[in-house]
Amino acid sequence: MDRPDEGPPAKTRRLSSSESPQRDPPPPPPPPPLLRLPLPPPQQRPRLQEETEAAQVLADMRGVGLGPALPPPPPYVILEEGGVRAYFTLGAECPGWDSTIESGYGEAPPPTESLEALPTPEVSGGSLEIDFEVVQPSSFGGEGALETCSAVGWGPQRLIDPKSKEEAIIIVEDEDEDEQESMRSSRRRRRRRRRKQRKVKRESRQRNAERMESILQALEDIQLDLEAVNIKAGKAFLRLKRKFIQMRRPFLERRDLIIQHIPGFWVKAFLNHPRIPILINRRDEDIFRYLTNLQVQDLRHISMGYKMKLYFQTNPYFTNMVIVKEFQRNRSGRLVSHSTPIRWHRGQEPQARRHGNQDASHSFFSWFSNHSLPEADRIAEIIKNDLWVNPLRYYLRERGSRIKRKKQEMKKRKTRGRCEVVIMEDAPDYYAVEDIFSEISDIDETIHDIKISDFMETTDYFETTDNEITDINENICDSESPDHDEVRNETTDNNESADDNETTDNNESADDNNENPEDNNKNADDNKENPDNNKHTYGNNFFNGGFWGSHGNNQDSSDSDNEADEASDDEDNDGNEGDNEGSDDDGNEGDNEGSDDDDRDIEYYEKVIEDPFDRDQDDYEDVIEIISDESVEEEEGIVEGIEQDEDVYQEEGNYEGEGNEDVWEEGEDSDDSDLEDVLQVPNGWANPGKRGKTG
C-alpha cells in the first residue's frame, strides 16, 4: 500500500530497440602508488606495546571500536619495514585499482608530488604510526584534506594531487618526548629525596652535638658541686681526726708499755705476717729480737707523708738506738724515702756479709737503707696500715698454726690406730677458733678510704692527709676476736687508770690474782696440762687491768668511731684536701677552722665525739650486745666450714651450751648499778676455760 505522503511513482523511460544502450564506463584509474617513507633510527623505533596502542587509536578513529588493533577495511595495502607499518586503503570502485595493488605486491612509481608536499618532520619523524586512506574523489566533492598529528598538535593541511585528485589522511603519534619528560621528573624526584636525606642527617648531627654539650655541661656543674662538698668533708674529717687522735693516744702508750714486757713480740709479728717475711732472713730475726717498739707517725704538713720509727735495745749489730725511715711526697706526688744511716759494728755490714750469704740482699735492713726498690712503698704501706694497727693477731698466729699441726698429727694417729679418741680438755676448741680468725686476717681487704693508722698518731702533729682512711669497723672486729675475748674479766670504768683498775674474776678466783707478771707466762702451759685449773688461768692485774682494759677502751672508742664514720661514709676524700683548702703548709690551721660553714658541717661530728666516755650506759650496752651477736653469728658460720672430727663438733656443742648458760646467769645476777663498772659481752667463744668437759 502506498503511503499518503508519497507521490505517484515516476515513470521510467523505456528504451527503444533503436536506442543502443550506453557504453560501459571506462575502467578505473590505477591506484596511487605506495608512498616510501624514510624509516627512523633503531633507538627511536616504537616498541610492540606502543605500536599496538597506536593501531588501537587508528581503529577508534575509523570507527571500528574498542578491542584489538585491526587493520582498516579492505581493500588495503600494508607496508611494514623496520617496525613501521602503513595501511593504504582504496575505494572499491576507485579507478585504476589492480589486484596486484590490492594484494600488496604491485609496484608503481611513487608520487613525487605527494612526497614533496609533505613536511619533512612529519615524514621522517620518530616513532610513527601512519594510516593512509584513499577514497574516490567524487565522494568528497573534489579536493582532499590532509590532517597530521605531531608533537606540536593537530592541524589540517591540504595536499592536492593534480593527477589522481585523491585525498590522503596521515596520522602521526610521537611518544619520545613523554618518556624523556618522565625520566627527567624521576631524576628530579631522586635529587630532591637525596637533598632531603642530607638535610635530615645534618640536622640530627647538630641536635646530637647540642645534646652532648648540654650533658657535659651538667656533668661539669655536678663535679664542681661535688668538689665543694669534698672540701667541706675534708675539713670536718680533719677536726674529727684530731679528736680521735687525742682519744687513742693513752691506749697506744699503754700498748707500747705492754709490748715491751713481751720478749720477741715484734719479731714474731713480722715473721707471721704473710707478706713481710720475704725481707727477713735469719740474721734479721736475731736483730729483731732486740726491737722493743715500732711507731708510725705522720709528718707535720698535710699530705706530706709519714715515717716509721724502730726502737732497739743495745745489740751487737749496730749502735743506733732508734732508726727512722721517712716517706715524703715530692712535687710530682711520688713517695721518696729517706732513712737514718745505720752505724754497724765492724764486720756486721750487710755488704761485707754478701759474699758468704746469698740472701743478704733479701734483708729488711737492706730494704731499710735502699731507696730505689720498687716494692719499698708497698711494704711500707703494709707495715703502716696492717701490722702496726693490730700486731697482736699476727703475734698469735704462730700458736694457732702449731695447734693445727698437732690436730693433723692426731687425726693421722687416729686413723692409723683405728681407735676412738676422746679429748678431755677444751684447749683445741679455743685454738681452732683462734686459727680461724688468724686465717681471716689474711684475706681481710683494706678499705682505702679510711685507715685506722691515720687516727693512731703518737706525735703532737695532728694535721693529716685525707687521701686514705681505713674503715674503723676493722678495729671492732679485732677487739671482738677470740684472742681478745680470752679473758672474761670485768673492767672498771675507763676514767680509772691502768694501775688502779679493780678487776673481778668471773672464774671465782678474785683473791688468787697474781701481782707478779712473770708468773703469767706459764698460764698457757698450765691450761694445757691442768684443765681443772682453768679458772685460775688469767688472773693478773697487769694484763687484765692494763692490757685487756685497754682493749675495752679501744672498743669504746671504736664504737664512737663507727658511729661517727657511718654519718660520713658517703663523703669522698680525694687526698687533695690541703690544696683545695688553700691552706699554707706552715702548721697553721686557721684556714681549716675559721669559717662558719665548717662549724655547721661538723656539728654532728662534735656532738658524737664531745664526750664519748659520758654517754648513756644503757645505749652503750645495746651497741655492745648487737656487735657481740654479730660476731657470734660470724664465728659460728666460719666454724661450720672447717673440717673437724666428730668428737670436736660434739665438744663444741656441749661447750657452747654450758658456756652461754653461765654467761647469762652472771648477766642476770648483775644489777643496773654494776653496769657502770662492768660491761658483759655474751660470747660463746670468749672463755673456753669455763666450758664443761667431755668424757
Curated annotation (Swiss-Prot):
Chain intervals with Basic residues compositional bias: 185-202
Modified residues (Phosphothreonine): 340
Post-translational modification: Phosphorylation at Ser-20 and/or Thr-340 impairs function on cell proliferation.
One annotated Gene Ontology cellular component of this protein: nucleus
Low complexity bias spans: 539-557
Keywords recorded for this protein, A-Z: Cell cycle, Chromatin regulator, Cytoplasm, Isopeptide bond, Nucleus, Phosphoprotein, Transcription, Transcription regulation, Ubl conjugation
Composition bias, Basic and acidic residues: 481-491, 519-535
InterPro entries: NAP-like_sf, NAP_family
Extra remark: Synaptic activity down-regulates TSPYL2 protein levels by inducing rapid proteasomal degradation.
Similarity comment: Belongs to the nucleosome assembly protein (NAP) family.
The protein's name in its UniProt record: Testis-specific Y-encoded-like protein 2
Gene label: TSPYL2
